[in-house]
Amino acid sequence: MQPRGERPAGRTQSPEHSSPGPGPEAPPPPQPPAPEAERARPRQARPAAPMEGAMQLLSREGHSVAHNSKRHYHDAFVAMSRMRQRGLLCDIVLHVAAKEIRAHKVVLASCSPYFHAMFTNEMSESRQTHVTLHDIDPQALDQLVQFAYTAEIVVGEGNVQTLLPAASLLQLNGVRDACCKFLLSQLDPSNCLGIRGFADTHSCSDLLKAAHRYVLQHFVDVAKTEEFMLLPLKQVLELVSSDSLNVPSEEDVYRAVLSWVKHDVDTRRQHVPRLMKCVRLPLLSRDFLLGHVDAESLVRHHPDCKDLLIEALKFHLLPEQRGVLGTSRTRPRRCEGAGPVLFAVGGGSLFAIHGDCEAYDTRTDRWHVVASMSTRRARVGVAAVGNRLYAVGGYDGTSDLATVESYDPVTNTWQPEVSMGTRRSCLGVAALHGLLYAAGGYDGASCLNSAERYDPLTGTWTSIAAMSTRRRYVRVATLDGNLYAVGGYDSSSHLATVEKYEPQVNSWTPVASMLSRRSSAGVAVLEGALYVAGGNDGTSCLNSVERYSTKAGAWESVAPMNIRRSTHDLVAMDGWLYAVGGNDGSSSLNSIEKYNPRTNKWVAASCMFTRRSSVGVAVLELLNFPPPSSPTLSVSSTSL
């Protein structure tokens, strides 16, 4: 039945039968189709006729309102997720093991390159409604399909080992990265080797690097774990041969190797010679070599191991030949991730001599107070050997000193070492081939030209050839396997002369003199050149700087420091020269400036806590710094 007052659909009334009076107009007769050219011509938009009862809008060219719903995508995916849960419009069923997972192809393909390739290429799966997957965990797949709809997933210890390979297969890189981030947070000595192997298996390069770095940095603890004991030979060899191993002493590497061998001694004893070649036996003390290594039956019964032991003992017995005897086994290890830390030791200011010390970390641009020495020392010589800092001689306000102490950055403590044979202040100190050299200085009565050498492995001082000139306020640096004693004061004049010590022949020879006379200057080596900065020429404090090239055999001037300095110290670090503290002719300084050889310019660096003249400075490569509970100071660089 038709509704009242309406015409039947599809029918029209002829004009002659239409009712008189007002009423709707009859529709216009159909028009013939326009010619092809006219149809192709773009039509001009006409203003829409106002509807009955509708508001009239102004026609403004280019005026419109853009709408952007920030929740549209979220709401759409929430709706699709609900549809999936109810099985609405699902066009694919994933079969894995005994599990069936319903989904929408378009959602999976839009999130996963793996599914995109499966459903859009000419693969048989693109036309199927049921697909079976292999080599993927059912629960992990279910979680990842749910993630495709919700963009949410929880990674934890219960699912990470199945979720990461599944995310890798489906190329869901965000989930894969989340798994790697979780594993990174779980690194511990007990599991880092396992995580490293897992990362390697699944080609997680960043996680692999981080886990490997963790193994190197925590090797002492890692070597005590079950995971280490179960490592194959190849991986043990790679670890113990690494230059980047973080060990307080080579004894830790030796003990780790023996523990691994003894875990399955019958199978592994054959590998002892190969393993011992990776242990840096020359860096062990002579007492340890004779008391432990030579006494170990696993080592003693292998001829190759006996040769390695003889090599190590020869390194100890002929210290002056260490430059010639050097091999990969005599090179100290440098911990992965370690950074340079500059130590300022002792020194003095007006009416005070300091025993306190501070250290500057370039990574944070901060100074930290570290443990004080047991003795106050100004005019002290400081150098680093291995992973320890040595403060040699100096002046305590009453007498010139022969005592020596060393700083352990791991424990943040100073320990006494064997004293020198001679009291020395204003001396030059440098390290070469694991030995500590002390030259010249003042013994309380006269300037000295004598020199001596300290071997930390044996704890003995040995006299070496004397310099040709008595030198007080001298500085010493090492370059190309030789020592250079630069300038100083001989009790009558300030010196421009320089002499070189060659350990192999135990002799000093003169080299080209500096352009200026200098005592109390700063001396350091950077990029194969010997630099001397500031000092005193007998009339004034200097800011001039010069550089010596062994190839040219001559000195040349470079940019002067911004401040006149003497009794300061100079050290190379991170490709820069740092001039630390000193005296400007009227007062002690806590300021520091650094030199860039690439731009030939000096710029200000962060100041120390304390003003220090006659200070000793050296650099250690450290992983964990600062020590616990050490005060810090961040001082902005100031205009010099």
From Swiss-Prot:
Substrate-recognition component of some cullin-RING-based BCR (BTB-CUL3-RBX1) E3 ubiquitin-protein ligase complexes. The BCR(KLHL17) complex mediates the ubiquitination and subsequent degradation of GLUR6. May play a role in the actin-based neuronal function. Kelch repeats lie at residues 341-387, 388-434, 436-481, 482-528, 530-575, 576-622. It is found in: Postsynaptic density; Synapse. Residues 287-639 are annotated as: Interaction with F-actin. Pathway: Protein modification; protein ubiquitination. Residues 638-640 are annotated as: Interaction with PDZK1. PROSITE patterns: BTB (PS50097). This is Kelch-like protein 17. The keyword Repeat applies. Transmembrane segments: none annotated. One of its GO terms (molecular function) is POZ domain binding. Disulfide bonds: none annotated. Residues 1-50 are annotated as: Disordered.
